[in-house]
Amino acid sequence: MNKESPNIRIIDIAEMAGVSVGTVDRVIHNRGRVSEENEKKVRAILEKANYQPNLMARSLASKKQYHFLATNPSFKPGEYWEAISEGIDKAASETELYNVNVTKLFFDQYDNHTFDAIVRTLFDEEDIDGVLIATLFTDSVVRLSRELDARDIPYVYVDSNIVGEHQLAYFGTESYDAGFIAAKLLMSQLGSHSDILISRIVHSGKNDSNQGKNRKEGFCQYLTEQGFEGNIHEVELRIDDTDYNFARLDEIFRANPRIEGAVIFNSTCYILGNYLKERGLENVKLVGYDLIGKNTQL
């Protein structure tokens, strides 16, 4: 029946069970008194029909306004966070008719202080029904999560997960596993004595990206398990500063000619990729993340 009647109504269930509509309503919502016999009949039909309450219709009828907040890193066209922002916009558009309003709060993904600043204004909003949190900065996100817990406001995480908090859901990949697989992929192309370059984008404040930290942990764990005997070199690069980046990378590669592999744990793989291409370092294998335009064009 569940395939034939996906939109079964309460009145249909009442007719099949031989009870009143009010009895079905009380069983579905666990309210009021219902005889054991009638409850069994109704629940049997609910299970057989795979009945799910029509939450959208209920929302339309209730007149209640729902207000959700979404913390969203600022981005340039084609960057990783653009797709997530567009997804939020799409969800907001599709649920607007059901009394749902979504407000986006933007911050600099390379500066945890800007995230803390929007958090300070977040609770100026009235009647918050839920928050979507971009989990770039672990310490800041944990503080926000615990404040939301104290206020009994539900929240979900996007991008990377943080274990031990009370998020309703997490949307993203397993960061640690992604780093582990990246190392496995890179080492399949290198010898155990090859040197590896790990690049990171400089962040303002004291926090690196939670996603990047987890990926790096998984990456290094694989190397340890495989008995990696080469050296790991690390370099800090700047977003949108090609001259600085090329100068730093020139220094690294001149001083460490045995570097044969490189990895960056966020969506800015194109920075290293463009350098390697420009310098003709075709022997260096590069691993990165996220199918944004600048990366796929390499």
Language model regions located:
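Amphipathic helical "hinge" segments at domain boundaries
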Residues: 53-117
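Hinge/beta->alpha junction and helix N-cap segments in small-molecule ligand-binding domains
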Residues: 73-82, 103-115, 172-178, 200-220, ...
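Flexible loop/hinge segments that line or gate small-molecule binding clefts
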Residues: 137-177, 292-297
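Short helix-capping segments at alpha-helix termini
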Residues: 94-98, 151, 223-230, 277-284
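Hydrophobic alpha-helical
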Residues: 130-149, 233-294
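Proline-centered loop/turn at the N-terminus of a beta-strand
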Residues: 130, 152-156, 169, 195, ...
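N-terminal helix-turn-helix DNA-binding module of bacterial transcription factors
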Residues: 1-62
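Hydrophobic alpha-helical segments within soluble ligand-binding/sensing domains
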Residues: 170-196, 245-246, 294-298
